[in-house]
Amino acid sequence: MAEALGLAGMTETPAVIFLGQRPGPATGLPTMTEQGDLLFALHASQGEFPRCILAPKTPDDAFYLTVKAFDLADKYQIPVFIMSDQYLADTQFTCERFDTSKITTDRHLVSDGELESMDAYKRYSITPDGISPRALPGQSKHLVVADSDEHNEEGHIDQTADNRILMMEKRMRKLKGLTMEMESPEVYGPREADVTLIGWGSSYGPIEEAVDLLNEEGQSLNLVHFTHIFPMKREEVRNILLNKGTTVCVESNATGQFAKILKTEADISVDVNLLRYDGMPFTPGYIIRALQEKKVI
């Protein structure tokens, strides 16, 4: 998968990768759950290129985020990860019928008319936003050329230093527009609280319920939950998380992977990591007991 991911990054081919996480390495715990592949999704394959990571919190969210993933992949010509896990896949939910009227499809291809008006077609044309015109092979009289080696605007191999800089910067410029399309994290509960729990992906339900149970007992907690993981809206995330009380990052992995992304992408350091990596999903009771053991509440 990592090799194919790099090929998509270099050829600027849209790709959506559904990554269903479970405990590894190797066969690991094949029927149990974990959130252990986040940093793999962020860094997999050789070299640097733009990518996007989304993590649905519910089946409803999975449906609509998948639609968004395909749109972003087509628009920015990048790989997009959808991070699920065994817990989200196996849990039974009752939800409203999906509203397909919200769905629009745009492959973001160059039109036949635009191609006919071009004297020459450059698949990797240098553009201000980094997005080059994408045509399908056979769509017009123009030749579509792609190569996994570094290439010039026409798609032919070019390994000169000047060309490498031009193409690398062109690809990375996509991150600016992509970041604008990311949604800020959801804040659940009171805006101001003594303790802020931070979660991502499928852990939303158990954390939400733990917040409700503790607030009913007179505690003061809220939840900041992420479904749009990367790229991150740095300033918006900082505005939400700075000057909070005690911050606790709740994750199903052994190393606090999302907390590391918060540090590198938003320069936010959490106070406490609440981690579970025994293959079982979070429950409200587990979260509450862990908060008590860590003397957070």
PLM feature spans:
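Flexible, low-complexity linker and terminal segments
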Residues: 65, 70-297
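Short, conserved catalytic or adaptor-binding loops enriched in Gly and charged residues
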Residues: 40-47, 265-266
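Short, basic, glycine/proline-bearing loop/turn elements
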Residues: 51-57, 219-224
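Short, functionally important structural connectors and interaction interfaces within domains
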Residues: 30-33, 46, 180, 274
